[in-house]
Amino acid sequence: MSVGRRRIKLLGILMMANVFIYFIMEVSKSSSQEKNGKGEVIIPKEKFWKISTPPEAYWNREQEKLNRQYNPILSMLTNQTGEAGRLSNISHLNYCEPDLRVTSVVTGFNNLPDRFKDFLLYLRCRNYSLLIDQPDKCAKKPFLLLAIKSLTPHFARRQAIRESWGQESNAGNQTVVRVFLLGQTPPEDNHPDLSDMLKFESEKHQDILMWNYRDTFFNLSLKEVLFLRWVSTSCPDTEFVFKGDDDVFVNTHHILNYLNSLSKTKAKDLFIGDVIHNAGPHRDKKLKYYIPEVVYSGLYPPYAGGGGFLYSGHLALRLYHITDQVHLYPIDDVYTGMCLQKLGLVPEKHKGFRTFDIEEKNKNNICSYVDLMLVHSRKPQEMIDIWSQLQSAHLKC
Protein backbone atom coordinates (compact mmCIF):
# COMPACT_ATOMS: atom_id res chain seq x y z
CA MET A 1 0.00 0.00 0.00
CA SER A 2 1.40 3.44 -0.95
CA VAL A 3 2.16 6.12 1.63
CA GLY A 4 -0.62 8.32 0.26
CA ARG A 5 -3.26 5.64 0.70
CA ARG A 6 -2.11 4.98 4.26
CA ARG A 7 -2.50 8.63 5.14
CA ILE A 8 -5.98 8.77 3.60
CA LYS A 9 -6.99 5.67 5.57
CA LEU A 10 -5.59 7.12 8.83
CA LEU A 11 -7.46 10.40 8.30
CA GLY A 12 -10.65 8.46 7.71
CA ILE A 13 -10.23 6.58 10.99
CA LEU A 14 -9.58 9.81 12.90
CA MET A 15 -12.68 11.45 11.42
CA MET A 16 -14.83 8.48 12.41
CA ALA A 17 -13.40 8.61 15.94
CA ASN A 18 -14.22 12.33 16.23
CA VAL A 19 -17.78 11.74 15.04
CA PHE A 20 -18.17 8.97 17.63
CA ILE A 21 -16.86 11.15 20.47
CA TYR A 22 -19.15 14.03 19.42
CA PHE A 23 -22.13 11.67 19.40
CA ILE A 24 -21.35 10.38 22.90
CA MET A 25 -20.97 13.91 24.30
CA GLU A 26 -24.27 15.04 22.80
CA VAL A 27 -26.10 12.04 24.24
CA SER A 28 -24.56 12.69 27.65
CA LYS A 29 -25.44 16.38 27.50
CA SER A 30 -29.01 15.61 26.49
CA SER A 31 -29.34 13.12 29.34
CA SER A 32 -28.09 15.69 31.89
CA GLN A 33 -30.50 18.31 30.65
CA GLU A 34 -33.42 15.91 30.87
CA LYS A 35 -32.57 15.14 34.50
CA ASN A 36 -32.22 18.83 35.31
CA GLY A 37 -35.50 19.64 33.58
CA LYS A 38 -34.49 23.10 32.41
CA GLY A 39 -31.14 22.18 30.92
CA GLU A 40 -29.33 24.57 33.30
CA VAL A 41 -26.05 24.07 35.11
CA ILE A 42 -26.62 23.08 38.75
CA ILE A 43 -24.80 25.43 41.14
CA PRO A 44 -24.24 24.14 44.72
CA LYS A 45 -26.00 26.21 47.36
CA GLU A 46 -23.05 26.02 49.80
CA LYS A 47 -19.26 26.20 49.51
CA PHE A 48 -17.60 22.90 48.67
CA TRP A 49 -14.83 23.61 51.22
CA LYS A 50 -15.45 25.75 54.25
CA ILE A 51 -13.88 26.22 57.65
CA SER A 52 -15.53 24.03 60.24
CA THR A 53 -16.99 25.37 63.47
CA PRO A 54 -14.17 25.74 66.03
CA PRO A 55 -14.20 23.04 68.75
CA GLU A 56 -15.14 24.10 72.26
CA ALA A 57 -12.25 22.32 74.02
CA TYR A 58 -9.18 24.55 74.24
CA TRP A 59 -6.54 22.07 73.02
CA ASN A 60 -8.67 21.04 70.03
CA ARG A 61 -9.31 24.67 69.17
CA GLU A 62 -5.62 25.59 69.31
CA GLN A 63 -4.68 22.51 67.29
CA GLU A 64 -7.20 23.49 64.63
CA LYS A 65 -5.48 26.86 64.34
CA LEU A 66 -2.12 25.13 64.03
CA ASN A 67 -3.54 22.86 61.33
CA ARG A 68 -4.55 25.92 59.32
CA GLN A 69 -1.04 27.30 59.51
CA TYR A 70 0.46 24.18 57.96
CA ASN A 71 -2.32 23.43 55.46
CA PRO A 72 -2.04 25.71 52.39
CA ILE A 73 -5.75 25.45 51.53
CA LEU A 74 -6.95 26.09 55.08
CA SER A 75 -4.37 28.86 55.43
CA MET A 76 -5.77 30.55 52.31
CA LEU A 77 -9.31 30.30 53.64
CA THR A 78 -8.17 31.74 56.97
CA ASN A 79 -6.69 34.75 55.17
CA GLN A 80 -9.92 35.25 53.22
CA THR A 81 -12.02 35.28 56.39
CA GLY A 82 -9.75 37.81 58.08
CA GLU A 83 -8.85 35.39 60.84
CA ALA A 84 -5.12 35.43 60.09
CA GLY A 85 -4.60 38.59 62.10
CA ARG A 86 -6.27 37.08 65.13
CA LEU A 87 -4.00 34.03 64.92
CA SER A 88 -0.71 35.80 64.28
CA ASN A 89 -0.07 36.79 67.89
CA ILE A 90 -0.81 33.39 69.39
CA SER A 91 0.67 30.91 66.96
CA HIS A 92 4.37 31.05 67.81
CA LEU A 93 6.06 27.95 69.16
CA ASN A 94 8.83 28.47 71.74
CA TYR A 95 6.96 31.41 73.21
CA CYS A 96 7.98 31.06 76.85
CA GLU A 97 6.13 33.86 78.58
CA PRO A 98 2.87 32.75 80.25
CA ASP A 99 -0.01 32.94 77.77
CA LEU A 100 -2.41 34.96 79.91
CA ARG A 101 -5.00 34.79 77.16
CA VAL A 102 -5.96 31.30 78.39
CA THR A 103 -7.28 32.71 81.67
CA SER A 104 -10.18 34.27 79.78
CA VAL A 105 -10.73 31.88 76.86
CA VAL A 106 -10.68 28.60 78.83
CA THR A 107 -14.02 28.15 80.56
CA GLY A 108 -13.59 27.85 84.32
CA PHE A 109 -9.82 28.32 84.15
CA ASN A 110 -9.57 29.45 87.78
CA ASN A 111 -11.28 26.25 88.93
CA LEU A 112 -8.85 23.92 87.16
CA PRO A 113 -6.20 22.04 89.16
CA ASP A 114 -2.89 23.90 89.30
CA ARG A 115 -1.14 21.36 87.06
CA PHE A 116 -3.57 22.20 84.24
CA LYS A 117 -3.18 25.93 84.77
CA ASP A 118 0.60 25.64 84.48
CA PHE A 119 0.36 23.38 81.44
CA LEU A 120 -2.00 25.71 79.55
CA LEU A 121 -0.10 28.88 80.45
CA TYR A 122 3.16 27.46 79.06
CA LEU A 123 1.74 25.22 76.34
CA ARG A 124 3.80 26.89 73.60
CA CYS A 125 7.16 26.90 75.33
CA ARG A 126 9.74 24.37 74.08
CA ASN A 127 12.87 26.48 74.28
CA TYR A 128 14.83 24.70 77.01
CA SER A 129 18.58 24.17 77.00
CA LEU A 130 20.62 21.15 78.01
CA LEU A 131 22.26 21.37 81.44
CA ILE A 132 23.98 17.99 81.08
CA ASP A 133 24.80 16.65 77.62
CA GLN A 134 26.55 13.61 76.17
CA PRO A 135 27.68 14.97 72.79
CA ASP A 136 29.90 11.96 72.00
CA LYS A 137 27.40 9.28 72.99
CA CYS A 138 26.68 8.35 69.38
CA ALA A 139 30.21 8.80 68.00
CA LYS A 140 30.05 5.18 66.91
CA LYS A 141 26.85 4.78 64.91
CA PRO A 142 24.50 2.99 67.34
CA PHE A 143 22.41 0.08 66.24
CA LEU A 144 20.12 0.59 69.25
CA LEU A 145 19.74 3.67 71.43
CA LEU A 146 18.17 3.00 74.83
CA ALA A 147 16.47 6.17 76.10
CA ILE A 148 15.03 5.89 79.60
CA LYS A 149 12.77 8.49 81.20
CA SER A 150 13.85 9.06 84.79
CA LEU A 151 13.70 11.52 87.68
CA THR A 152 16.70 12.83 89.63
CA PRO A 153 15.91 10.89 92.87
CA HIS A 154 15.67 7.54 91.01
CA PHE A 155 19.34 6.60 91.51
CA ALA A 156 18.60 2.97 92.39
CA ARG A 157 16.49 2.43 89.27
CA ARG A 158 19.15 3.87 86.98
CA GLN A 159 21.90 1.77 88.54
CA ALA A 160 19.82 -1.40 88.28
CA ILE A 161 19.25 -0.70 84.58
CA ARG A 162 22.99 -0.14 84.03
CA GLU A 163 23.73 -3.50 85.65
CA SER A 164 21.02 -5.39 83.79
CA TRP A 165 19.10 -4.77 80.58
CA GLY A 166 20.58 -1.32 79.91
CA GLN A 167 24.20 -2.42 79.57
CA GLU A 168 26.07 -0.73 76.75
CA SER A 169 27.75 -3.10 74.31
CA ASN A 170 29.44 -3.41 70.95
CA ALA A 171 29.01 -7.01 69.81
CA GLY A 172 29.16 -7.92 66.14
CA ASN A 173 29.36 -4.25 65.07
CA GLN A 174 25.97 -3.65 66.69
CA THR A 175 26.52 -0.90 69.22
CA VAL A 176 24.01 -0.44 72.04
CA VAL A 177 24.17 2.87 73.91
CA ARG A 178 22.16 4.25 76.83
CA VAL A 179 20.91 7.65 77.99
CA PHE A 180 18.66 8.68 80.86
CA LEU A 181 16.32 11.62 80.24
CA LEU A 182 15.87 14.09 83.10
CA GLY A 183 14.49 17.53 83.80
CA GLN A 184 14.91 19.62 86.92
CA THR A 185 13.28 18.71 90.23
CA PRO A 186 12.98 22.00 92.15
CA PRO A 187 12.35 22.34 95.92
CA GLU A 188 8.84 23.72 95.29
CA ASP A 189 7.92 20.22 94.07
CA ASN A 190 9.10 18.83 97.41
CA HIS A 191 12.35 17.40 96.01
CA PRO A 192 15.62 17.56 97.99
CA ASP A 193 18.69 19.15 96.42
CA LEU A 194 20.50 16.21 94.83
CA SER A 195 22.49 18.18 92.27
CA ASP A 196 25.90 17.16 93.65
CA MET A 197 24.98 13.47 93.63
CA LEU A 198 23.64 13.75 90.10
CA LYS A 199 26.80 15.53 88.95
CA PHE A 200 28.94 12.71 90.38
CA GLU A 201 26.69 10.09 88.75
CA SER A 202 26.85 11.82 85.39
CA GLU A 203 30.64 12.18 85.45
CA LYS A 204 31.04 8.51 86.36
CA HIS A 205 28.62 6.95 83.88
CA GLN A 206 28.41 9.53 81.07
CA ASP A 207 24.77 8.66 80.35
CA ILE A 208 22.67 11.55 81.75
CA LEU A 209 20.79 14.05 79.59
CA MET A 210 19.24 16.85 81.63
CA TRP A 211 17.27 19.90 80.47
CA ASN A 212 16.38 23.04 82.43
CA TYR A 213 12.63 22.50 82.55
CA ARG A 214 10.46 21.40 85.46
CA ASP A 215 10.23 17.60 85.45
CA THR A 216 6.55 16.82 86.04
CA PHE A 217 4.08 14.29 84.69
CA PHE A 218 2.46 16.88 82.42
CA ASN A 219 5.86 17.82 80.99
CA LEU A 220 6.65 14.32 79.72
CA SER A 221 5.51 15.27 76.22
CA LEU A 222 7.96 18.17 76.42
CA LYS A 223 10.65 15.65 77.42
CA GLU A 224 9.71 13.65 74.32
CA VAL A 225 10.16 16.66 72.02
CA LEU A 226 13.47 17.66 73.62
CA PHE A 227 14.77 14.10 73.32
CA LEU A 228 13.79 13.90 69.64
CA ARG A 229 15.57 17.21 69.09
CA TRP A 230 18.69 15.73 70.72
CA VAL A 231 18.47 12.67 68.47
CA SER A 232 18.21 14.87 65.39
CA THR A 233 21.35 16.82 66.30
CA SER A 234 23.49 14.41 68.34
CA CYS A 235 22.41 10.91 67.30
CA PRO A 236 20.83 11.14 63.83
CA ASP A 237 22.41 7.92 62.56
CA THR A 238 21.07 5.52 65.17
CA GLU A 239 19.23 2.69 63.46
CA PHE A 240 16.69 2.06 66.22
CA VAL A 241 15.45 3.65 69.44
CA PHE A 242 13.91 2.05 72.50
CA LYS A 243 12.25 4.61 74.75
CA GLY A 244 10.78 3.61 78.08
CA ASP A 245 10.32 4.22 81.78
CA ASP A 246 12.86 3.46 84.49
CA ASP A 247 10.58 0.93 86.22
CA VAL A 248 10.31 -1.59 83.37
CA PHE A 249 12.23 -4.76 82.60
CA VAL A 250 13.43 -5.05 79.01
CA ASN A 251 14.71 -8.21 77.33
CA THR A 252 17.33 -6.42 75.27
CA HIS A 253 18.63 -9.61 73.65
CA HIS A 254 15.18 -10.48 72.35
CA ILE A 255 14.79 -6.94 70.98
CA LEU A 256 18.11 -7.21 69.14
CA ASN A 257 17.14 -10.58 67.66
CA TYR A 258 13.84 -9.13 66.50
CA LEU A 259 15.48 -6.09 64.91
CA ASN A 260 17.99 -8.26 63.07
CA SER A 261 15.14 -10.26 61.56
CA LEU A 262 13.44 -7.25 59.95
CA SER A 263 13.47 -6.45 56.26
CA LYS A 264 14.62 -2.97 55.24
CA THR A 265 11.07 -2.06 54.27
CA LYS A 266 9.65 -3.15 57.63
CA ALA A 267 12.44 -1.46 59.57
CA LYS A 268 12.15 1.93 57.88
CA ASP A 269 9.05 3.23 59.70
CA LEU A 270 8.97 0.68 62.53
CA PHE A 271 6.96 1.63 65.61
CA ILE A 272 5.84 -1.20 67.91
CA GLY A 273 4.56 -1.44 71.47
CA ASP A 274 1.49 -2.23 73.53
CA VAL A 275 -0.93 -0.28 71.35
CA ILE A 276 -4.24 1.05 72.66
CA HIS A 277 -7.14 1.77 70.28
CA ASN A 278 -10.40 3.74 70.68
CA ALA A 279 -9.40 5.25 74.01
CA GLY A 280 -10.44 8.66 75.25
CA PRO A 281 -9.67 11.04 78.11
CA HIS A 282 -10.62 10.07 81.66
CA ARG A 283 -13.10 12.46 83.26
CA ASP A 284 -12.71 11.26 86.86
CA LYS A 285 -10.80 13.96 88.74
CA LYS A 286 -9.27 11.38 91.08
CA LEU A 287 -7.41 9.60 88.28
CA LYS A 288 -3.83 10.34 87.24
CA TYR A 289 -4.87 10.63 83.58
CA TYR A 290 -7.83 12.97 84.22
CA ILE A 291 -8.42 15.50 81.44
CA PRO A 292 -11.23 18.12 81.80
CA GLU A 293 -13.78 18.54 79.01
CA VAL A 294 -12.70 22.17 78.56
CA VAL A 295 -9.17 20.99 77.71
CA TYR A 296 -9.76 18.13 75.24
CA SER A 297 -12.70 16.49 73.49
CA GLY A 298 -12.94 13.41 71.29
CA LEU A 299 -11.12 10.09 71.11
CA TYR A 300 -7.37 9.59 71.12
CA PRO A 301 -5.57 8.23 68.06
CA PRO A 302 -3.99 4.77 68.42
CA TYR A 303 -0.98 5.04 70.74
CA ALA A 304 1.56 2.79 72.43
CA GLY A 305 1.54 2.64 76.22
CA GLY A 306 4.23 4.91 77.63
CA GLY A 307 5.93 2.12 79.57
CA GLY A 308 8.05 1.61 76.48
CA PHE A 309 8.06 1.28 72.70
CA LEU A 310 10.51 0.57 69.90
CA TYR A 311 10.92 2.54 66.70
CA SER A 312 13.37 3.24 63.88
CA GLY A 313 15.92 6.04 63.87
CA HIS A 314 14.51 7.14 60.52
CA LEU A 315 11.10 7.57 62.11
CA ALA A 316 12.62 9.41 65.09
CA LEU A 317 13.78 12.15 62.73
CA ARG A 318 10.38 12.30 61.05
CA LEU A 319 8.68 12.51 64.44
CA TYR A 320 10.87 15.40 65.50
CA HIS A 321 10.05 17.43 62.40
CA ILE A 322 6.31 16.83 62.80
CA THR A 323 6.25 17.89 66.49
CA ASP A 324 6.08 21.53 65.37
CA GLN A 325 2.66 20.75 63.92
CA VAL A 326 1.19 19.19 67.07
CA HIS A 327 0.61 21.11 70.30
CA LEU A 328 1.99 19.50 73.44
CA TYR A 329 -0.50 17.33 75.31
CA PRO A 330 -0.51 16.43 79.04
CA ILE A 331 -0.06 12.68 78.36
CA ASP A 332 3.15 11.87 76.50
CA ASP A 333 2.25 8.50 74.97
CA VAL A 334 -0.97 10.01 73.58
CA TYR A 335 1.07 12.93 72.23
CA THR A 336 3.37 10.52 70.39
CA GLY A 337 0.26 8.84 68.92
CA MET A 338 -0.93 12.25 67.72
CA CYS A 339 2.40 12.85 65.98
CA LEU A 340 2.25 9.43 64.32
CA GLN A 341 -1.27 10.17 63.13
CA LYS A 342 -0.03 13.44 61.64
CA LEU A 343 2.53 11.41 59.68
CA GLY A 344 -0.20 9.06 58.47
CA LEU A 345 1.21 6.15 60.51
CA VAL A 346 -0.37 3.75 63.00
CA PRO A 347 1.71 2.11 65.75
CA GLU A 348 1.81 -1.68 65.56
CA LYS A 349 0.78 -3.81 68.51
CA HIS A 350 3.37 -6.42 69.52
CA LYS A 351 2.54 -9.17 71.99
CA GLY A 352 6.03 -8.92 73.49
CA PHE A 353 5.17 -5.61 75.18
CA ARG A 354 3.34 -6.13 78.48
CA THR A 355 2.84 -2.67 79.94
CA PHE A 356 0.08 -4.06 82.15
CA ASP A 357 2.31 -6.87 83.47
CA ILE A 358 1.94 -10.63 83.06
CA GLU A 359 -0.24 -13.02 85.03
CA GLU A 360 0.62 -13.27 88.70
CA LYS A 361 1.28 -17.02 88.46
CA ASN A 362 3.97 -16.43 85.80
CA LYS A 363 5.90 -13.61 87.48
CA ASN A 364 8.41 -15.92 89.16
CA ASN A 365 8.78 -18.22 86.16
CA ILE A 366 11.88 -17.04 84.30
CA CYS A 367 10.75 -18.79 81.12
CA SER A 368 7.82 -16.34 80.95
CA TYR A 369 10.30 -13.58 80.09
CA VAL A 370 12.21 -15.33 77.30
CA ASP A 371 9.91 -14.24 74.46
CA LEU A 372 8.91 -10.88 75.93
CA MET A 373 10.41 -7.50 75.09
CA LEU A 374 9.08 -5.44 77.99
CA VAL A 375 7.28 -5.98 81.29
CA HIS A 376 5.93 -3.19 83.48
CA SER A 377 6.59 -2.72 86.30
CA ARG A 378 9.60 -4.18 88.13
CA LYS A 379 11.63 -2.98 91.12
CA PRO A 380 15.41 -2.45 90.79
CA GLN A 381 16.40 -5.72 92.44
CA GLU A 382 13.83 -7.62 90.38
CA MET A 383 15.37 -6.23 87.18
CA ILE A 384 18.80 -7.50 88.21
CA ASP A 385 17.49 -10.92 89.25
CA ILE A 386 15.49 -11.50 86.05
CA TRP A 387 18.40 -10.39 83.87
CA SER A 388 20.84 -12.63 85.71
CA GLN A 389 18.59 -15.67 85.32
CA LEU A 390 18.07 -15.00 81.60
CA GLN A 391 21.87 -14.97 81.08
CA SER A 392 22.35 -18.33 82.80
CA ALA A 393 23.97 -21.00 80.63
CA HIS A 394 21.82 -23.56 82.45
CA LEU A 395 18.51 -21.94 81.48
CA LYS A 396 16.18 -24.43 79.82
CA CYS A 397 12.69 -23.40 78.73
UniProtKB/Swiss-Prot annotation:
Listed GO MF terms: N-acetyl-beta-D-glucosaminide beta-(1,3)-galactosyltransferase activity; N-acetyllactosaminide beta-1,3-N-acetylglucosaminyltransferase activity
Ranges of the Cytoplasmic topological domain: 1-7
Keywords (A to Z) from UniProt: Glycoprotein, Glycosyltransferase, Golgi apparatus, Manganese, Membrane, Signal-anchor, Transferase, Transmembrane, Transmembrane helix
Enzyme class: transferase
Record-level GO BP terms: axon guidance; cellular response to leukemia inhibitory factor; keratan sulfate proteoglycan biosynthetic process; O-glycan processing; poly-N-acetyllactosamine biosynthetic process; protein O-linked glycosylation; sensory perception of smell
Pathway: Protein modification; protein glycosylation
Expression sites (tissue/organ): Ubiquitous.
Phenotype for residue 245 to A: Loss of enzymatic activity, no loss of B3GNT8-binding
Domain of life: Eukaryota
Transmembrane segments: 8-28
Disulfide bonds: none
KW Transcription (keyword) present: no
Location in the cell: Golgi apparatus membrane
Pfam families, per the entry: Galactosyl_T (PF01762)
Quaternary assembly: Interacts with B3GNT8; this interaction greatly increases B3GNT2 catalytic activity, independently of B3GNT8 enzymatic activity.
Family in the record: Belongs to the glycosyltransferase 31 family.
Protein name: N-acetyllactosaminide beta-1,3-N-acetylglucosaminyltransferase 2
Natural source organism: Homo sapiens
